[in-house]
Amino acid sequence: MNNKEVEKRAKIISENNNNLEKCLTTKALPSNVDVSLSEGLILALLKQGVRKYFAIFGHGSTDFAEVLRIYEEYGVTKTYNFKNEVEMAHAATALSWQYKEIPAVVTSIGPGGLQAMAGSLAASSNGVGVYHIYGDETTYGEGFNMQQIPKNEQDLYGKITALMSESYVFHTPEALREGMRRGYLKTKNPTKAGPFYCLLPINTQPKIIKGLNLVTLPSNKKIHLSNQISETNVEDFQKLTENIDKVVIKVGGGSRDFHEQVRKLSENLSAPVVLSPGSLGVLPDN
């Protein structure tokens, strides 16, 4: 890794209000850059609006932490150090859930990742988008690496995280765009978002991606679903409710962003609203 080049890019981004899109539009930064996987991931996340990192670093995330240090020195990113991975994952979930700002959780290799994974259940079960970045065993087939799962089987952490939500093992640095595309679609899913796990093998973190095209990386745009409700649907619903004495509205987790609409519908129909575990707080108790 050429620290001078990393510092140069970080400075340019900082001078452009930490807006990578602006840097590319004004050609302050070239579209194609030679960067390590670690820096490429930081740039890719920055383009998606991720600037806050909740971290407990270790030998599994040393290279990533070193690049992050440089970007923080120029004010592009902000890192918050924690002492407990479960607490860290919960804090990241709260930031994304309450303030609509997606952060990244960073751990080392082994037990730290498992702890953060346990904490990510809150994000997974409540449909909250958060990035999780864990150090991972090398791609050289050396077997489990230090405190990793002691079993001679390939890609164990990738399998576990894929079961928890969705994940990508960056075995090949050039696959960064594909991993980030999947992460974008998961963390910003308008109906069922969730945590996305990036597994960074120790040996691929410093590997250089030649000519990474920053333009093709996903941006920070929201994913919008087209409205499938027609006037016919509304008329049919109106006819249905006219012939029913009592209406009860059952509200699930997908209603969290539509509390005003749910309230108005409830008032117009004089109908009580039954909440589910994923929609608690959508409406006040009274």
Where would I find each of the regions flagged by the language model?
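N-terminal alpha/beta PP-like core and its mobile active-site loop of ThDP/TPP-dependent enzymes
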Residues: 2-286
